[in-house]
Regions:
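Acidic-residue sensor for enzyme active/binding pockets
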Residues: 63, 123, 134
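Conserved hydrophobic/aromatic "anchor" residues
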Residues: 108, 113, 207-208
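Hydrophobic adenine-recognition pocket in adenosine-nucleotide-binding enzymes
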Residues: 117, 121, 151
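Glycine-rich nucleotide phosphate-binding loop and flanking beta-alpha elements
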Residues: 68-70, 123, 153
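Hydrophobic beta-strand segment of the Class I
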Residues: 64, 116-117
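Conserved N-terminal segment of class I S-adenosyl-L-methionine
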Residues: 1-109, 162, 196, 219-235
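Alpha-helical membrane segments in multi-pass integral membrane proteins
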Residues: 115-116, 135
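S-adenosyl-L-methionine-dependent methyltransferase catalytic module, highlighting the catalytic core
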Residues: 4-6, 126-235
Length: 235
């Protein structure tokens, strides 16, 4: 079979020499590791975790809304103090092995974690200010929120895409948009189209200082649109 693009390289998610195979021109979701099936943003995130936190396997880590491959699976397998959460609404505290946590109003104690990880989650949060504030609260001093979020608007101002009305119904302010959700077949509504000014939003709401990293390295299978990784540090 002839693919759109393929190359040999090293996958930081499964730690193997592999082929990276793109089945079409939208690399973000379709430039896949032949072994672990990870995609570029997952590899970019794992690369930066290992670069800046080489002792990550010894750290206390919370990941919200993990998937079952790539960086999430590696963290789960290598980190004894890794906790995964999903948000199921008002329900039991543990569901399907996941802790039930609303990122905007968490039940974790203050200063619980060295790292908080989210992958393409923040664009589905209705109140990101509360979520960033809560993430900062649960981080230890010097800890970091390492995350991916599609910076669709780039240099343009962040736009609110959807909100909740007084009855918690979703109101889209722009064209209706959903992304896949592993625990909800309806998908997750897109609530914001972020730009680079997200760093100001994070600082104003949480006091965390944020860097944006853009990696382009086909040898590591890291090439695609909107795969920036953000690291927000609690000073």
């Amino acid at each position: 079979m002839k693919y759109y693009f393929e190359n040999d390289g090293y996958c930081v998610c499964c730690d193997k020499n592999v082929k990276f195979i793109a089945t079409n021109s939208w690399y973000r979701d379709n430039y896949i590791c032949s072994n672990c099936k990870s995609i570029p943003r997952e590899r970019a995130l794992m690369y930066l975790i290992e670069k800046f936190y080489p002792n990550y396997n010894l750290l206390d880590i919370h990941e919200s809304s993990p998937c079952k491959r790539g960086a999430s699976l590696k963290l789960q397998n290598k980190c004894p103090n890794y906790i995964a959460s999903q948000y199921y609404g008002e329900s039991d505290k543990i569901i399907n092995g996941y802790r039930n946590e609303n990122l905007e109003s968490q039940t974790f104690k203050d200063e619980s974690f060295d790292l908080v990880i989210t992958q393409d989650v923040m664009e589905h949060i209705f109140n990101p200010q509360s979520a960033f504030r809560e993430i900062a609260r649960t981080l230890k001093p010097g800890g970091a929120h390492i995350f991916t979020v599609p910076l669709i608007n780039k240099e343009r101002t962040t736009e609110c895409w959807a909100k909740l009305d007084d009855n918690n119904n979703i109101i889209f302010l722009k064209e209706e948009e959903y992304h896949g959700n592993p625990i909800n077949p309806k998908g997750s509504p897109v609530t914001f189209h972020y730009g680079y000014d997200i760093v100001d939003l994070i600082y104003k709401s949480s006091g965390m200082v944020t860097q944006i990293f853009t990696i382009d390295n086909v040898d590591l299978g890291i090439r695609a649109e909107y795969i920036d990784v953000l690291i927000s540090r609690k000073i």
